[in-house]
Amino acid sequence: MKNLLFLFLAAAAPLAANDHPADAWELTLESGYTWNVGSNTPIDYEIVPTQLTLRTPTHLTWWEDENGARLIVRGRFSLMMETISVGPESYYFGLSGAPSIEYWFPGAKTSAFFSIGGGVGLTDSTNVPGGQGQDFTLNWFAHLGLRQEIAENLSLLGGAYFVHHSNGGQTSPNPGIDALGFTVGLGWRF
């Protein structure tokens, strides 16, 4: 029995001791506020974006120096849950995916990240001119921010966030929302 326990602990030790935070999975919950900035609609939308995001371990290390700084690429998959606080619709639920390009500073406690990607979603469309026009929509986003570890496996995130929603030309006219704002959140590494 002791030998079996020793083998289990020896095999689990490398899994528990990731050399670098980017080599582990990360689950984040972020929310914020965005305002309409485009001319795709006459409606001054305001949106509360909330995302539950899963980041994969590092897929690609572009660069690494002797002090521990790294430039890496991870996968990012998000469940988008948005409250439309100003506009004819009231919610948006979607899925999105993107690469997460991250610069990790020496010491592996702080990183800057950038993602640009897209996906699909559903909203409660109305017949209001300038509104989404149909329930099924496409999304794309850009997210630039910073992550700071505040405790073992726990980090704070904050950044600038841009999101676009439209129906991809499936209706005429093709209304869209371009919204820019900020997000803040909490991340858990496992």
PLM regions and their residue ranges:
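Short glycine/proline- and aromatic-enriched beta-strand/turn motifs that initiate or cap beta-hairpins
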Residues: 16-60, 181-190
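Short loop/turn motifs that connect adjacent beta-strands in outer-membrane beta-barrel proteins
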Residues: 18-24, 58-73, 104-111, 150-154
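Transmembrane beta-barrel strands of outer-membrane/channel proteins
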Residues: 25-35, 75-81, 114-120, 158-162
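Residues that define the transmembrane beta-barrel architecture of outer-membrane proteins
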Residues: 23-25, 44-50, 89-95, 134-140, ...
